[in-house]
Structures are given as C-alpha cells and as structure tokens.
C-alpha cells in the first residue's frame, strides 16, 4: 500500500500503529495561498517520487473542505493507474462541499469554522500546535 499525505503530523502518528508494510510518499498541493478560503486554483507544490501504477493507494488528507482541491487531485492520481484509490481525512466539513468527493475514512466531521494546529495552518502559522483549535476572526 502507498499513502499520500496532506497532514504529515497525522500520518506520522498513525504510521506507528500500521502493522503491514507500506510505502509513504509525500505530495504538497495547495489552493489556499495566504487566504482562509480556497482560491479554486490547484497548485502542485511537490509531486510524488514513486509510481502509483498497480498500487493500493490511500490519500491521507488533513481536512476536506470545498472538495475542489481533492477532486482535482484524485482525478489526476486515477490517471496514474493505481489498483485502488481511497481517501482518508482527519477532519471533514461536509457542509462546505462544492464538489462531491467520496471520503472513505473520516476522523471527525466538523462545522464550518477555520481550524489550526496538528499540522493545519493559517498563513504558515500554528501548524505546530499539539491540538486543533478554532481561529476567530474579527
């Protein structure tokens, strides 16, 4: 199996409990920039190092919001020929969904609030917090 990671902190914690051989590969995809809302423009910041051809793939994401970024990403990854492609997310905001994205494994459904910590950031800050908190804007 191969995992693609949106939330490095999450997968590092979970990898300690995985008892089967896996290959971890990291990909960085962004549609936020320095804003709190998705721009809708998907940017591949870092692509995968390994081929997905005929592999069982689980995309591990920190948060699923509008679905725009993940819809684009999942379609792109399907074109690379994996045997299967599943999506796991720590946090899901289903009420924010603009594009239908099927999430196979969800940690927590959360309301439409901007959250930081445990790998999630606001303008590259607060990623290091050992918990997830809500940012309140005035």
Pin down the residues of each PLM region.
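Residue-level marker for buried hydrophobic side chains located in beta-strands
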Residues: 58-59, 118
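Single conserved hydrophobic/aromatic residue that forms the stacking wall/gate
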Residues: 1-6
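Short helix-capping segments at alpha-helix termini
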Residues: 17-21, 80-81
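Active-site loops and adjacent core secondary-structure elements that bind or stabilize anionic groups
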Residues: 9-10
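PRPP-dependent phosphoribosyltransferase catalytic core
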Residues: 75, 79-138
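Active-site signature of alpha/beta-hydrolase-fold catalytic machinery across serine-
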Residues: 13, 72, 76
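Short, glycine/charge-rich flexible loops or terminal/linker lids adjacent to PRPP-binding catalytic cores
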Residues: 21-57, 66-72, 99
